[in-house]
Amino acid sequence: ICTGLTLAVLSIVMILYGSFVGRTRFEVKEVTYTSPRLPQAFDGYRIVQLSDLHIGSWQGNTPAIRKLVDLVNAQQPDLIVFTGDLVNHRAVELNDFQEILAGLKAGDGVYSILGNHDYGPYFHWKSKQDQDNNLIELKQRQAAMGWKLLNNEHTFLIQGNDSIALIGVENQGEPPVSYTH
């Protein structure tokens, strides 16, 4: 019984630490990519990749998102890519954060794609039209933040006489449960 109680207390402490302390201890993990196919002009090109903010989970904690934006900008990236799941369900989750996230800066800009949560499939919408309107609003908010959404689109990043393609594809994933009305 003593071992079980110890494990239970340890589990609770770990959950509380992760929920209240660990979740705002953002860390930078640097990865160096090398390839003979990478144009020489892109040697040293810095890309910051962010994903799965699920911004609705940060309600009431704008300082943490400011801290994240400051940390990203301190990396002096050439490019920032956001790889989906900006929101949990609804575009209005961005209300307190849109201006903060607009502060992300990179020489070649901020590009994004949509994740499964961004399409709003896990929310009980009154109608399909409401869900579609939410997606339109989310795309508009990203544009207002200065983010360039690549949804089955591409752009070329140019350095000197060299270029590479940045390609964004639509999320083809399906939610585990379909909520249709």
Model regions: which residues?
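Acidic, histidine-bearing metal-coordination/catalytic regions of metal-dependent phosphoesterases
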Residues: 1-46, 51, 55
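Structural motif
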Residues: 37-40, 72, 158
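Intrinsically disordered, low-complexity acidic/polar segments
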Residues: 42, 175-176
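Conserved small/polar residues in nucleotide/adenosyl-binding loops
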Residues: 180-181
